[in-house]
A protein has these predicted regions:
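Extracytoplasmic/secreted envelope proteins and their assembly/folding machinery
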Residues: 148-152, 197-200
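Assembly/oligomerization scaffold segments
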Residues: 1-136
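Short beta-strand-centered interaction patches in the first periplasmic/extracellular domains
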Residues: 121, 128-130, 174-287, 292, ...
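Second-shell loop/turn segments in exported
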Residues: 135-145, 185-191
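An acidic/polar, Gly/Ser/Thr-rich interaction patch typically located in mid-to-C-terminal regions
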Residues: 44-80, 259-307
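N-terminal export/assembly leaders
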Residues: 151-190
Length: 307
């Protein structure tokens, strides 16, 4: 097992690259590729982040897009497309292990970095569709039932973050895979004009995972996490995530290896590490680090329970 892990860890990398970055105008459907002018491409996804993000910096010489009705007149992408925000960006990249990532993101911010008489360098901050839609939607309806059902409704219902029109499919958007772990407890609430992401993160703190044998689920729970990856949207309990088998064994021992393989029983060796051990009791108490409880009250029948 250790030999196979070591062999997999040291697979020879191959060439990586950006295959496609196409921007589509919101105004007239005009499309332009910036793949040849791209200087920097950064893609971010994290288990602690609600949405995926990317940053693209490209150089524009000013002869990129046709200007107006004159086919012989060209101008910069910023002016000719034009870039005003929320443009659709279809991206395809490939890493050193030949893993291809295809995604559709949207322009969240346009930052002109430098500009002179010869060229313009522009940075685009991109975000997923759900990140943009979250700022447009407010939840005012009442929700009854299990917390996992509430999460599913917020992510799939057309009134909230779900796909709305077939026109989005023409832009390259595809409905994302929704990976939701069932919860044991129920919770009824009213949206109170909150954003979907706010409600999802709020509900995740009180969610209790459903036990496989169905024998409970109202005990101590560390809560749930909500995050997005290139593969979809995920809502998983911390207990389930930490209960999995290790995906990677890492060793840090401050000593050089006699050969190129990691030590027996480990997959890789860490070059350096740092520890964050800032202790703030007041802040931890505010967040409920040492004691949490869920109070359930039904005003119609005066039912009261502390979980």
């Amino acid at each position: 097992t250790g030999a196979r892990a070591a062999e997999a860890s040291y697979t020879e990398g191959k060439g990586s690259g950006i295959e496609k970055i196409d921007i589509t105008s919101n105004k007239n459907g005009k499309q332009v590729s910036i793949v040849n002018g791209t200087m920097v491409f950064l893609y971010y996804e994290s288990i602690l982040q609600d949405a995926t993000h990317a940053v693209v910096s490209y150089s524009d010489s000013g002869n990129s897009v046709g200007s107006g009705d004159n086919p012989k007149k060209f101008t910069s992408i910023t002016e000719g497309l034009p870039l005003v925000g929320q443009e659709t960006v279809n991206i395809k990249v490939q890493d050193n292990n030949q893993n291809a990532l295809e995604m559709t993101l949207y322009v969240n911010k346009v930052n002109p970095l430098t500009e002179d008489t010869r060229k313009q360098v522009v940075q685009l901050q991109l975000a997923s569709r759900e990140f943009i839609m979250n700022e447009k939607v407010r939840v005012n309806t009442r929700f009854d039932g299990k917390i996992s059902d509430h999460i599913k409704k917020l992510l799939e219902d057309k009134k909230y973050l779900g796909p709305t029109e077939k026109s989005e499919e023409k832009e390259g958007f595809k409905a994302k895979k929704i990976d939701i772990e069932p919860t044991e407890n129920t919770y009824n609430f009213v949206g109170n004009n909150k954003k979907p992401y706010y409600l999802i993160n709020w509900l995740s703190r009180g969610a209790v995972p459903k036990l496989p044998e169905g024998g409970g689920g109202t005990g101590i729970s560390a809560g749930f996490l909500f995050w997005e990856t290139n593969k979809g949207l995920h809502f998983k309990s911390i207990d389930t995530l930490l209960g999995q088998n290790p995906k990677l064994s890492v060793l840090y021992n401050e000593s050089p290896d006699e050969n190129e393989l990691p030590p027996e029983g480990y997959d890789v060796k860490a070059l350096e590490y740092s520890v964050s051990n800032a202790v703030d009791i007041q802040q931890k108490l505010k967040l409920g680090a040492y004691s949490t409880r869920l109070i359930v009250f039904n005003p119609f029948n005066t039912f009261y329970e502390v979980i």
